[in-house]
């Protein structure tokens, strides 16, 4: 009798253990950890193909922070992505103009020169009041109302191309204007502008962080192909990013097709410095 009683009481306990282990396995798979950072300018949620759009949204939800092209998404989609705990930054090209933008014809007269390696793009005169006003009071207002967590601003490198005081002040005017929306601003590239603003003490009043492409990798635009960065350029960028960090700016890296061993090196570097990085599959940033 005692033996029979022991067998009966043990069986439910065994079932409970099995159920617990299965449940643990299920939730572990379902709640895979998010990636830290991703830049996805080449994808959108408005293709009109429901399954594809849903796949895009799910991809973005798998990151803690993403950069996307706001015109490729609806405010409702941005809210859906954010509901999963993802911070969403919107891309805004302040130093150049692409010929596929609906406002291209209105502003091409303010362009300065073609953008090398980017056939559809032109450097812009950022000192022009009409361009400044459009970025600040039209696009800035429109995009901020979509519920973005911040702006990702491209091509302050215009100051490297045209190192004139009016260009420098024009960029500062645009950044100051965008600050009215109380959103963090991250500058993509623009090391010459960033370092000058650090030197004159205005950096932290203008923007909050920097993203630098190709610290550890580089792009051969003739193919295109993706290679390891040369030592001299890598050392320059590392010194520059240390200056940015010391100035109180957050730092992000975007690399292209870093292989496994190089990715481990970048992981160690970013972990040591407190930076975030994204390993892009291609220039299309999909």
Predicted segments — roles?
Residues 1-2, 26:
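Short, low-complexity interaction segments enriched in Ser/Thr/Pro/Gly
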Residues 3-14:
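Bacterial N-terminal signal peptides that target proteins for export
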Residues 14-23:
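Bacterial N-terminal signal peptides
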Residues 24-32:
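Sec-dependent signal peptide cleavage junction
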Residues 31-286:
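Glycan-processing catalytic domains of CAZymes
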